[in-house]
Amino acid sequence: MSRFFVSGYDSESSSEEEDLLTSSEEELMSSEQESDSEFDDEFANDDDSDSSDSDSDGRPSGPAYFLKSSFRKGAGGDSDSDSEDEGRRVVKSAKEKLTDDMKDAVEAVNSAKRQENWISALTEFERLGRLLVRAGQQGFGTPNFYIKCLVDLEAYLIETTANEKESTRKMNANLARAFTSLKQRVKKQVKEFSHLVELYKSEPELFDKEEPVETIEKDAEIQATPLASSTGRALSPVFATLKSVAETRGKKNIDKFEQVQILEDLLEEVSPKGSPFEIISIYQMLLSIRFDASSHHAFMPLDQWQKNKDTLNDLLDFLEKHSNEYQVSELGTASDDIDLEPPANADGIRILPGSVTSHIERLDDEFIRYLQNTDPHSLEYIDRLKDEKDTYNLVVRGQLYVEKTTPDHVRGTYQGEQLARIVMRRMNHIYYKPDQLIKANESEAWRHLSGDSQIVAKNSEPKDVINGLAEFLSKQDGAIYPKGALLFSVYYHAVNNDYSVARDMFLSSQVHQGINNADSSIQVLYNRAMVQLGLSAFRYGNIEESHQALNEIANSQRLKELLGQGFNSKYPSQATVAEKQRLLPFHMHINLELLECVFMTCSLLIEIPQLAAASNSTKESRRKTNIKSFKSKLEFHDRQYFTGPPESIKDHIVHASISLQKGDWHNAYKLLSTIKIWKLLPNNDQLLEMMRGKLQVEGLRTYIFTYKSIYTKLSVVKLAKIFDINEEEVLSIVDKMISSGEVSASLSDDKKSINFVSSEHLQRTRLQELAIVMNEKIGLLTDKNEKTASNGHGRKTTQQQQQQQQKEQREQTHDENIKFRYANVNTNNDEFQTIA
């Protein structure tokens, strides 16, 4: 029966029931069973003759029969029996219940000890330990009888061990293992409660009481006595607190936020009158503990990040104020005694061990992780991105301080790496931005800073800032800093329309040769720089170089992974922590639709004339350029029965290519210019004007390739009118085509017409081309039949010659193609493979 019906329901009693354990619950249930059995007996003894008298006897009927008598109508006469039931109930608190359980466990341990049943003793002692943990969690303290049990058990185990050594009779293996485990656990508990154990041995009468021994006075005496250092010296209260926090750092079941609060209170108390050494030590410990508190989260909470940023600024303020006395540097020597100040150097400055660079790097990493875990299309991301200004200001300020604390003779070496790391961090914040944003960031960063930098002067132009930082990094030890400086510079110049400088830096450095053995972050930066170089070449009008730079990476199936912008081959939930941290925040991404649009436009301008030339030439004179990528898109479009108006970027470019094949450059330009993504590029009008000129030129070339087998003469004036370009430019284009051997023609004496002449390779009709293809296939079929007839040993001369020719062609083009080959980042195991 439910307890709700037994004792009634009350909101207050129900809430108290959560904290109380009723020791007479079994009695209550037994009383219910007795009453229920009485009802059952009465029910069993009833017969049909008594049923008519049930109402007159006052016995319940129907559902009311199963209610307790206290709930029946007219049950007030049973008040005496109810009061007797209430008198038998004993309600104990959770503390009393837990104490009884612990006493039972102690008795079980003592009983097993007397019987030398060490397996049972170990089991009961472990149960007693779990109960003790519960008592500590609920704030009940350590019972006195537990300390008694612990001391007695320790003494008995020592005595048993001594007797066991003297005795010839040994324990069996199971008892011996249990006995050894029990000794270890008892020893650990004695060490943990050493102060209570010592107190019990000295004053056992204090433990005769039921309540735990009041150790407040003892604790106060212990706290009043300063802690000792490793050399036996007494620690001050400040360093005693710091040492206690440091000793518990990293351990389980430690409330890190409580440690943060302790350090914050300590800093507030010590700041007005404490020594600089104490205050600096508190600042460094507080920053580290705050970072530890959020180490198990995906990112640091915003309020904690803001507090750490303010604390780091306060630390730099304090260090700058006492720069003639104390410095924090990675060059400082650590000591086991946290309260000992290091000796002063020749300048009278004490170098404290620490790292301003590491604190700034960690703060910046937490900022990036917050952005990575925020929806980039939300207002929260935009609001959070505003904090980048504060982060960059802190990076510049930290660089100035590290410059002052890093001697000149260690710069460029491994010992001075702290300066190189923070300069690298500064470059990482500005290399992808246009000059206007860099200038705004620099002016804001230097507004509240005094002094100047030896690496980059104050109020320098954006170009000088990038060049100065890159020059400093290029002189550092290790491969990551020179390569990073070079790729940062290439990316910056490419973004800011300085294509020629970016291209010369990229090619002259030969950075592509060892990129597959570089760090993953450098590989991602390399791919980003190469893509930005291709986009810059397109804006500059170098279509072929842009196509060459973007060709491999745009056709890759792992485009997002190569650029550090996501995953193509796996779900984000399947990625490791290292792979996720390698990703860039959204505001640093390269627009992949823009990349695809630029690459396909370059393919259109290059491959459409090649397709026209190949369709009207002999096989021997066709160009070796691979034109399958764009040709497959056109063939797929031609196989469609119904094609609607263009919608996507790809549709616009395919329709534009079809128009260009027909010589309709104007319609091709109209289709390309309606693509809205061009507005993302700077100088949009100049870009469209450049595309217009390229379409006119390539349209003219396509027209000549298409109709050279039909016409014997073409008018220069007519061509100039069709393609809306002047006659001099038409003559220049045709002259280049003639001199390069693309067409067999000549210009008339008056330069007014183009005369096509028959070449040594006769122009063939479509039927002739199909006949030649059929002849080649028949030859291959004949070779296959001969090979089958001779048990697989047919003629191989032709095949070997073809393979040799293909090998020579690959060797010739390998050196040229590898210049713009992307770094293949292997995200599965963070190893890097070279593309074959």
UniProtKB/Swiss-Prot annotation:
InterPro entries documented for this protein: EIF3C (IPR027516), EIF3C_N_dom (IPR008905), PCI_dom (IPR000717), WH_DNA-bd_sf (IPR036390)
Biased composition, class Basic and acidic residues, residue ranges: 86-97, 807-817
Subcellular location: Cytoplasm
Annotated segments matching region Disordered: 1-97, 783-817
Keyword Protein biosynthesis: yes
A single MF term (Gene Ontology): translation initiation factor activity
Biological process according to GO: formation of cytoplasmic translation initiation complex
Homology family: Belongs to the eIF-3 subunit C family.
PANTHER family recorded: EUKARYOTIC TRANSLATION INITATION FACTOR 3, SUBUNIT 8 EIF3S8 -RELATED, EUKARYOTIC TRANSLATION INITIATION FACTOR 3 SUBUNIT C-RELATED
Record's subunit section: Component of the eukaryotic translation initiation factor 3 (eIF-3) complex.
Protein name from the UniProt record: Eukaryotic translation initiation factor 3 subunit C
Organism encoding this protein: Meyerozyma guilliermondii (strain ATCC 6260 / CBS 566 / DSM 6381 / JCM 1539 / NBRC 10279 / NRRL Y-324)
Lineage summary: Eukaryota, Fungi, Dikarya, Ascomycota, Saccharomycotina
